[in-house]
């Protein structure tokens, strides 16, 4: 069976590099499933989980918290360039929980002062923290 090479790259380096038979990501237009021989494509990614189903006998599934970025698909090579990304096994859940609480406090404070920019920034931080928490539970 044909497989794809999947790489997730952040400013800190390569976070993931394996072969896969199926990938699921979320773009602004919704969830996108990627199979081998997918058309060439570049698309923005939302803050969301990335599901990678590896090939082979064990059918292992890897989960990665993607915090924005882009995906490029070309000739069975899938490259995700993300602001940050963490595999489920690498997520510090207590740190993510603290980030969630901090973001919720910042949203409340910004809403009382009607600071729209701070509300938006804090909501992004909250989405990122919730994404990390959700992926850690996979």
From Swiss-Prot:
NCBIfam families cross-referenced by the UniProt entry: ATP_synt_epsi, PRK00571.1-3
SUPFAM superfamilies assigned to the protein according to its UniProt record, in alphabetical order: Epsilon subunit of F1F0-ATP synthase N-terminal domain (SSF51344)
Record keywords, A-Z: ATP synthesis, Cell membrane, CF(1), Hydrogen ion transport, Ion transport, Membrane, Transport
Organism: Streptococcus pyogenes serotype M49 (strain NZ131)
Source organism phylogeny: Bacteria, Bacillati, Bacillota, Bacilli, Lactobacillales
Family named by the database record: Belongs to the ATPase epsilon chain family.
Subunit structure: F-type ATPases have 2 components, CF(1) - the catalytic core - and CF(0) - the membrane proton channel. CF(1) has five subunits: alpha(3), beta(3), gamma(1), delta(1), epsilon(1). CF(0) has three main subunits: a, b and c.
Protein name per its UniProtKB record: ATP synthase epsilon chain
Subcellular location: Cell membrane
One MF annotation (Gene Ontology) recorded for this entry: ATP binding
């Amino acid at each position: 069976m044909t497989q794809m090479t999947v790489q997730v790259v952040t400013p800190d380096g390569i976070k993931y590099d394996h072969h896969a038979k199926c990938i699921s990501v979320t773009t602004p237009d919704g969830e996108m499933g990627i199979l081998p021989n997918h058309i060439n494509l570049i698309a923005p990614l939302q803050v969301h989980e990335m599901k990678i189903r590896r090939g082979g006998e064990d059918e292992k599934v890897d989960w990665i918290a993607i915090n924005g970025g882009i995906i490029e698909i070309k000739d069975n090579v899938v490259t995700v360039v993300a602001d940050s990304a963490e595999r489920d096994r690498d997520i510090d859940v207590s740190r993510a929980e603290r980030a969630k609480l901090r973001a919720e406090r910042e949203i409340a404070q910004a809403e009382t002062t009607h600071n729209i920019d701070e509300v938006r920034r804090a909501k992004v931080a909250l989405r990122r923290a919730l994404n990390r928490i959700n992926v850690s539970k996979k």
